[in-house]
Structure formats: structure tokens, C-alpha cells
């Protein structure tokens, strides 16, 4: 046999088979050994990689987010098929026709943040593969900004009537431009003010937010809101309605230390007496007033004290229904006995307002004598949420704090607590 001639025939045959396979769009995977002699019988067993045409199989979807709040970003995602795909996201701003690549946006998804993009920006992705390039459809990013007309928005959205709008303030907003506030709330609007707070334990040092001076709570766990008087005067002088609230605080039932080192033996009734004293001494509340008088029922911070050489930490909890009733009944008794009205309220979150125990609403007894100022923020984007708040045993809310992200131009501050009120919110509960 002529071995040289046989080797040539074998080489020609191998090359012919390889050419045939290649013409079908298949290429053999890398050989385990570049020097191994070709084996005809092994060709059919070699793994093959097919080049797939680049194609978008799922388009990115448009999204709506808020400039502020809990939903301030959106993730655009694309699905594609093909071989060795590469991604490049692009944007197009409103009013332009140019697509511009986004630096480092080279994955299947792109996260767009409200702080980085203007409302109406469009996004697409260009996908490149071994067999072509595909462009996705454009997805639009809608960015919602806080509203300046929450009362009108709520009436249109929920079919309500007589709704007014307001802002609630405390010493944390000391120095705020009140003309800007009173202009924003409108002629029939309102301002809710913190009268005082029991949030700090006794003998606790803190910095006065109005004067920036170091001070202490002393022997009682309460502090008068240092901005209350000035803000109340400005609101009254502008002809806007007022509301007044007391932040629940340290009282004897929540202090587990033997010497009452946190609460100092203070009671809800004593808190109510102090609230009324500061309310009447301010001068803006008269016998003709029907202002909401609110007990703010919320938990507070954890505080640490050294007692007899040992460290003790307690967290300020929200008051219970019996504690709230003790405060509210004392306020009512003291005011009505002096010829004043008592338009009693409680403030709390919607989940707390609707909490239940053994099949009964926790706040049923409180709801019998008060109206409800409820906090329900949705995504907290400075706009009226898409759903009305839960109210538990109250038939409805009287005042609704819908956000802490209201933006009022000219105030010199950022986000503010904003509210809307029903038409009868300044009418005492019968």
C-alpha cells in the first residue's frame, strides 16, 4: 500500500467534512490538543456553538416614581437572545431627538434615580451580538413632584367636598418663613402647632432648637415648644386657622426604675394640665375658639441613664388607650369648666388607629370622645396617596397627614409635614 497517498486522501476527506460543517453555520469547539491527529470518527461528537441572531424578546417598561419618598428609582430591564451579547443603555431627554449612551450602563438592567433624571426622560438599550444589533423600544420615566394643591387633588380624586390644606410645625422648623406657609395653605387653610412635649426624661440635657443653648428638662419630663408662641402669633395674624398638639411622653406607668429616674412620677393628668396652661397663656386660644386639641400618640427614642452606678436604658413607648383617656378627659374638664370649647383629637398612624385586640378596636373608647388626625403617607412623595387611610373605630378621618415631603417655596427648609382637613374638622365632636 502507498501510505503517503492514503494520508493525502485522509487529509482531503477531513477538510471536506470540516468545510461542509462550517457552511451549515456550525463551528467545532476548540480541540483538546492542537497536535492530535485528526480522527474522522470523532468529528460528529465535537460540541458545536450556533451563532444566534440578536433579538429583543422582552422590552423595558415605562415607570412612574416620586422625586421624594420611598419610591424614587425605577429599574428598566430587557431580555434578548443571541450570541455573546453586549448591552449599552441610552437616554433621550424631553424635547430632544438625540440618544446618548449612559456611562457604565452595560448590563441587562439599568436603575434610574429620580435625583438624576428629569421627568419624561426616555431610555432604551442597544444589544450587540455576533449576529447583529437590536435596539429596544423606548421606556419613559415619569417623575412626580410634590403638589401645591393637595386639597383640590383630594376632592377630585375621592369625590370629597370642603377640603382645606395645612402644614404642621414644631421647634424643628424654628425660623421658617411663615408668610410662605400661610400663602401656601390659602385663605381657608390651617397650621397645626406643637404646644409641648414629654419626649425627654427628667434631668436630661439637650440643645434648645430655637436658641441653640444648652438646657435641661429639670424635675419634670416635659418641655414647652420654644417656637410655639411665635408661630401661633404669625398664624393668627395672617387670619389662618390653628390647631394645637401635645406629644405624649414619659409618665409613671412606663418607668420601671425604683426612683422614677425617667418619668419622675409624672402622670397623663399632669401632662394635660400643663398643656392647658400653656394653651391658655399663649393668648391665641379664646373662649370662641374651636381649634383641634390633639394628643399625639407615638413612640419615641430610647434613653440611657446611670442609676446607682448601673446603666439603664428605656424606650419611650406610645401611650395606651386608658392613658390617652386620662389626658383627654382632663383637658376637656379643665377647659369646659372655664367656658372654653374642647374639640378633642388624637393623632396616630393609620395602622395604629385600626389595631385590634380580641376582635375589638383598641381605640374604641377614645374614638367615642375624639376626632382623628391620621398619618397615612403612601409612598410619601408629597402628593395625595392613591388610597384613603384606615381609621379603625372612627367613621372617618377629620385631618389627614398625607406626607412629610411637602415642599413649600420660600420657607428655607426641605420636607414638611402636610395635611388636609374635612369641612367640619373645627367643629367639636358632639
PLM segments and residue spans:
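Structural beta-sheet core signal
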Residues: 193, 244, 295, 344-346, ...
Amino acid at each position: 500500500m502507498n501510505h503517503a497517498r492514503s494520508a493525502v486522501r485522509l487529509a482531503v476527506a477531513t477538510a471536506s467534512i470540516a468545510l461542509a460543517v462550517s457552511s451549515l453555520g456550525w463551528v467545532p469547539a476548540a480541540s483538546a490538543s492542537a497536535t492530535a491527529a485528526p480522527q474522522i470518527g470523532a468529528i460528529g461528537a465535537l460540541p458545536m456553538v450556533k451563532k444566534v441572531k440578536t433579538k429583543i424578546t422582552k422590552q423595558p417598561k415605562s415607570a412612574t416614581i416620586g422625586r421624594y419618598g420611598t419610591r424614587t428609582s425605577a429599574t428598566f430591564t430587557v431580555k434578548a437572545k443571541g450570541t455573546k451579547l453586549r448591552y449599552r443603555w441610552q437616554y433621550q431627554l424631553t424635547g430632544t431627538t438625540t440618544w446618548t449612551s449612559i456611562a457604565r450602563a452595560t448590563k441587562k438592567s439599568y436603575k434610574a434615580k429620580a435625583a438624576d433624571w428629569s421627568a419624561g426622560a426616555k431610555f432604551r438599550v442597544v444589544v450587540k451580538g455576533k449576529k447583529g444589533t437590536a435596539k429596544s423600544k423606548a421606556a419613559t420615566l415619569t417623575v412626580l413632584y410634590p403638589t401645591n394643591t393637595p386639597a383640590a387633588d383630594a376632592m377630585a380624586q375621592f369625590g370629597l367636598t370642603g377640603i382645606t390644606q395645612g402644614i404642621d410645625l414644631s421647634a424643628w422648623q424654628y425660623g421658617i418663613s411663615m408668610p410662605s406657609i400661610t400663602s401656601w395653605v390659602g385663605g381657608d387653610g390651617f397650621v397645626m402647632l406643637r404646644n409641648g412635649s414629654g419626649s425627654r426624661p427628667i434631668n436630661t440635657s439637650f440643645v434648645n432648637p430655637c436658641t441653640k443653648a444648652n438646657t435641661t428638662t429639670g424635675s419634670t419630663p416635659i418641655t414647652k415648644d420654644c417656637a410655639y408662641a411665635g408661630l401661633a402669633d404669625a398664624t393668627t395674624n395672617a387670619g389662618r386657622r390653628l390647631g394645637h398638639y401635645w406629644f405624649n411622653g414619659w409618665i409613671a406607668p412606663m418607668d420601671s426604675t425604683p426612683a422614677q429616674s425617667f418619668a419622675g412620677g409624672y402622670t397623663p393628668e399632669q401632662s394635660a394640665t400643663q398643656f392647658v396652661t400653656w394653651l391658655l397663656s399663649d393668648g391665641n386660644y379664646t373662649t370662641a375658639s374651636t381649634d383641634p386639641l390633639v394628643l399625639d400618640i407615638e413612640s419615641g427614642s430610647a434613653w440611657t441613664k446611670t442609676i446607682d452606678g448601673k446603666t439603664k436604658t428605656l424606650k419611650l413607648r406610645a401611650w395606651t388607650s386608658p392613658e390617652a383617656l386620662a389626658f383627654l378627659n382632663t383637658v376637656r374638664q379643665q377647659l369646659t369648666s372655664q367656658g372654653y370649647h374642647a374639640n378633642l383629637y388624637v393623632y396616630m398612624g393609620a395602622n395604629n388607629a385600626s389595631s385590634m385586640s380580641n376582635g375589638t378596636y383598641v381605640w374604641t373608647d377614645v374614638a367615642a370622645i375624639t376626632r382623628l388626625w391620621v398619618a397615612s403617607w403612601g409612598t410619601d412623595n408629597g402628593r395625595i396617596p392613591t388610597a384613603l387611610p384606615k381609621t379603625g373605630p372612627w367613621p372617618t378621618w377629620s385631618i389627614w397627614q398625607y406626607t412629610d415631603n411637602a415642599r413649600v417655596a420660600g420657607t428655607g427648609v426641605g420636607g414638611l409635614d402636610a395635611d388636609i382637613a374635612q369641612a367640619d374638622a373645627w367643629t367639636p365632636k358632639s
